[in-house]
Amino acid sequence: MAEGEKPKARIIRIFEISAFDPERGTFRGVNIRFEYPVGSGNYHDIVIPLEEYTPEEAERRVREWIQKYGGIIGKTL
């Protein structure tokens, strides 16, 4: 991140969960909770299967989420 540039998102919490998917059944995963935009108080969650989790993968998925959905956050329709 460039000097003076504000962060777009802040990872708040990372924790393991058990979740249910109708196609796969019960599985273990890692929940990534992040605030976007920073300071807004809006929190979002991404679940990554436990086998796929690495800190780098979590960061990549948060960035991917922001690119895909971040543009509509806060828009008045």
PLM region spans:
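N-terminal acidic leader/helix
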Residues: 2-40
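Acidic, low-complexity intrinsically disordered segments
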Residues: 2-8, 14, 40-77
